Amino acid sequence: LNNPDNKKEAPATVITTPYSFIIPCLTGIYGAMTTSDALPSQPFPDAARDAVYQAIFSRRDVRSQFLPKTIPDDVLGRLLLAAHHAPSVGFMQPWNFLLIRSVETKARIQTLFRKANEEARTQFKDERKDLYSRLKLEGILDAPINLCITCDRERTGQTVLGRTHMKEMDLYSTVCAVQNLWLAARAEGIGVGWVSIFHPHELKAALGIPENIVPIAYLCLGYVSEFLDRPELEKAGWLSRLPLEDLVFHDTWGQTGGEHDPLADTYQALRQQYGYA
């Protein structure tokens, strides 16, 4: 009765992408989705775009502000999924994610850190050494979850598309996973602290990591009391952020824009908008 002329109706559009979990999010940004094999190519609306930059500019390496608040499983799952969707050379996805909740395991890891940190302290001199001694460089026991992200350099065999001439690309890919997780965590109000002062072989032994697996990042994750307005090392006087224009070269190494830099006005506008550039 609803189709008296017995005409064939056009089939409803069905999203069939394996990444269909993205669709509800993008639908909220762009409106109705009308394709099953592509995502919109236009820029995000201003609010969504600004949220991405807000996560980037307000991301911090957290050491001292962790709260004893549990990260819900659904939030943790989103962070891991964001990490898993990092770009990777040859799509080899070389990462694994080792979650550490055990207080005993954390204590063993902190012991390794303290040993290495004292070794590191002796490598600095005079005022630098004194300042280093005052810095808190880990939140291993303070953070509810520790996470070791690793790289399996043999995951897809010895010959990897895109790694034939730059053998370190799988390591860099894993670092992209770290950054994805870090930015997603900031959007969720979760702090991340990267602890890198270990002897890698000792860390591997403590966590039972196989010989062929490379630990890339040991991260402390948790809700925080606050995010600092500037990086902690900058606030402590360790180093300052470098001017962007000193780091951008044109056409050949070392060639800055100088007085006629086409991006000069852009740098100034960025400083006014974000406080620094």
Q: What does each of the following model-derived ranges do?
A:
Residues 2-6, 19:
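Intrinsic-disorder-associated, low-complexity terminal segments enriched in Asp/Asn/His/Tyr and depleted
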Residues 11-15:
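Intrinsic low-complexity, disordered N-terminal segments enriched in polar/charged/small residues
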Residues 19-21, 30:
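Aromatic (phenylalanine/tyrosine) cluster motif
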Residues 34-44, 48, 55, 62, ...:
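C-terminal helix-cap and adjacent tail motif
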Residues 62-78:
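A short N-terminal beta-strand-loop micro-motif at the entrance of redox/enzyme domains
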Residues 79-84, 147, 156-206:
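Small-aliphatic-rich amphipathic alpha-helix that forms the alpha element of a beta-alpha
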Residues 93-174:
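Glycine/small-residue-rich phosphate/adenosyl-binding loop
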